[in-house]
A protein has these predicted regions:
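Conserved nucleotide-sugar phosphate-binding/catalytic loop shared by glycosyltransferases and other
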Residues: 28-79, 83-85, 262
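Donor-nucleotide binding loops and adjacent catalytic segments primarily
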Residues: 23, 178, 193-281, 333
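A donor-sugar binding/catalytic signature common to diverse glycosyltransferases
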Residues: 271-315
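Nucleotide-activated donor-dependent transferases that construct or modify glycoconjugates
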Residues: 1-12, 102-104
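C-terminal amphipathic helix plus adjacent low-complexity
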Residues: 341-379
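A nucleotide-sugar donor-handling region in carbohydrate enzymes
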Residues: 135-222, 245-248
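Conserved nucleotide-sugar donor-interacting segment of glycosyltransferase catalytic cores
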Residues: 89-158
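A short, glycine/small-residue-rich beta-strand->loop->alpha-helix junction that serves as a flexible
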Residues: 7-18, 221-222
Length: 379
């Protein structure tokens, strides 16, 4: 199969990370994959083995996902959006994919709906129409009004052959965060969680005995980092390593540094996952990929869900993890250095949680589902 995955990450890098993991699973089974990314470059993420196409990049203005900024930080104008659409159209015509996958859309990225509609209409007009799938995480941002769900249903009905829900239905079903109509239910395929291969310990033991603080690969998390810098003063027996994401990480590290704190600050690093099994504990938000890393590694963890701008996705996910051993959840608004230290002491003294019981092979299952649906379409 020739597969095109289209993704635009606007704040963090989780959507791109998941799209790349999904793409690698297709490659590993002998298929050709192109990932078209419309977000800003994320050098900490590997694109090895994939064809990678960078569109003119966009990012959100903080948590305002309706206000999109271009590569220079200005509000993206019509010409910029037109350049993105033209880039995608040229790529589609060149590749003539067998399978087209849109990450998150039409359940999100409404601010890019003209771009996606143009792509989907062009795909329908190809000499051989591709199988069209939507790829979504376990928990979505619930629609703020019924029309948003109705619009998504209309797009699914018009253009899509299936919806890949990257969740284990024993843990979380789509209706936890999104109204599932009869039409949508008929196109949903649960894949299990899309996770990279199981976490393997760092060959040099990096992170051993440390408290690792992270907030994903985007430019958020300064309040969490600052709290950790101060909390490190109260727990000097542990090395606190704070991994700062975003393209401006170096500047923010300078701003966050406190010479009276023993905390170590450095940019987010690509070997972060391999450090987790060695760590004494993790302090992080609760994005999809972070949650899977923690479930796979078994590392004790304090979760501080990202909840700015009416975001509820991470809070819902954290709530589902809270009953498991070795997890504590602290609301961002209530977080203080003292509360963070208390939560860390709690999770580090908790019983070791089992690494079994969750389906982590969602990428492989997605390939199988796509192949089956394509075979049925072309039979």
């Amino acid at each position: 199969m020739n597969v095109l995955i289209v993704v635009t990450h606007l704040l963090g890098t989780g959507h791109l990370s998941r799209a790349l993991t999904l793409g690698r699973a297709f490659v590993e089974t002998g298929h050709h994959v192109t990932v078209a990314s419309g977000g800003f470059p994320a050098p900490q993420l590997s694109t090895h083995g994939l064809a990678f196409e960078q569109l003119p990049p966009l990012r959100s203005d903080g948590v305002d996902f309706a206000r999109l900024l271009d590569k220079d930080g200005a509000v993206a104008d019509d010409a910029y959006h037109s350049a993105r659409r033209n880039h995608l159209s040229t790529l589609l015509q060149s590749l003539q994919p067998d399978v087209l996958i849109t990450e998150l859309y039409p359940f999100g990225r409404r601010s890019l709906r003209a771009e996606f509609r143009a792509l989907l209409e062009a795909a329908q007009a190809l000499p051989r129409r591709p199988l069209v799938l939507s790829s979504i995480r376990d928990i979505l941002a619930p629609p703020s009004k019924p029309k948003k769900a109705e619009d998504a249903d209309a797009m699914i009905a018009e253009f899509y052959d299936g919806v890949l829900v990257h969740s284990d239905p024993k843990a979380t079903t789509l209706d936890t965060s999104w109204p599932v109509s009869d039409l949508l239910a008929g196109k949903v395929h649960y894949t299990g969680y899309v996770a990279p291969p199981a976490v393997t310990p760092h060959p040099e033991g990096a992170g051993k005995g440390e408290i690792l603080v992270s907030a994903g690969g985007g430019g958020v998390g300064d309040a969490l980092y600052d709290c950790a810098v101060q909390a490190a003063k109260a727990m000097p027996d542990h090395i606190w390593r704070i991994l700062v994401g975003g393209s401006d990480a170096t500047t923010r590290i300078t701003q966050l540094s406190d010479p009276t704190s023993p905390a170590l600050l450095e940019p987010a690093r690509p070997d972060f996952r391999t450090m987790l099994p060695h760590a004494a504990a993790s302090v992080s938000m609760c994005g999809y990929n972070t949650a899977l890393d923690l479930l796979q590694s078994g590392t004790p963890a304090v979760l501080v869900p990202f909840d700015a701008g009416k975001e509820v996705e991470q809070s819902l996910r954290a709530r589902s993890l809270a009953p498991l051993p070795g997890f504590a959840v602290e609301p961002a608004a209530a977080l203080t250095p003292d509360r963070l230290c208390a939560a860390l002491h709690q999770v580090m003294q908790d019983t070791q949680r089992s690494l079994d019981g969750f389906e982590f092979d969602g990428a492989r299952r997605s390939v199988e589902i796509a192949a089956s649906l394509l075979g049925r379409q072309r039979a």
